[in-house]
């Protein structure tokens, strides 16, 4: 299968502008490469303040955000993002108990993915957002 056909099979909708916020460099790189391969436009931030600066300077369709960041929380990042413009928010977190997911929803997250991120689940969520 050609790379273009592979990319098309993974990108089940329009190309999205995605901000990935993750302090673990290997996870950040893996998500960035994968999402680029899916055909999305990716920006990255390694902490809450970097993410807020990017949100101030650029528009995003989706913010894919870790909850526990060294200089703040994903909850703060999403609150800032949603004040600027309606954006879909996807939590990526090692905290995946029912109460964690509910807290995320109350804070503004539309979806919650547990770490390690299941790439098929991520693709499904992005497909729902892009539809």
Predicted feature residues:
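Acidic, metal-coordinating helix/loop segments flanking the phosphotransfer/catalytic sites
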Residues: 44-62
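Conserved acidic carboxylate
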Residues: 22, 69
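Non-catalytic signal-transmission and effector/linker regions of two-component phosphorelay proteins
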Residues: 1-19, 120-131
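Active-site residues of response regulator receiver
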Residues: 66, 93
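Acidic catalytic/metal-coordinating carboxylates
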Residues: 47, 73-76
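Short amphipathic alpha-helix used as the core "switch/output" element in two-component signaling
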Residues: 75-87, 126
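Two-component/phosphorelay signaling modules centered on CheY-like receiver
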Residues: 25-43
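Alpha4 helix (beta4-alpha4-beta5 surface) of REC/receiver domains from two-component response regulators
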Residues: 76, 96-111, 124
């Amino acid at each position: 299968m050609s790379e273009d056909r592979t990319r098309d099979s993974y990108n089940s909708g329009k190309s999205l502008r995605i901000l990935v916020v993750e302090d673990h460099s290997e996870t950040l790189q893996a998500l960035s490469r994968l999402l680029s391969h899916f055909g999305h436009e990716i920006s990255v931030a390694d902490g809450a303040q970097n993410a807020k600066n990017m949100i101030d300077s650029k528009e995003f369709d989706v913010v894919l955000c870790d909850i526990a960041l060294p200089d703040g929380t994903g909850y703060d990042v999403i609150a800032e993002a949603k004040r600027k413009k309606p954006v879909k928010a996807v939590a990526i977190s090692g905290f995946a108990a029912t109460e964690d997911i509910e807290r995320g929803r109350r804070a503004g997250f539309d979806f919650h993915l547990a770490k390690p991120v299941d790439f098929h689940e991520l693709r499904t969520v992005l497909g729902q957002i892009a539809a």
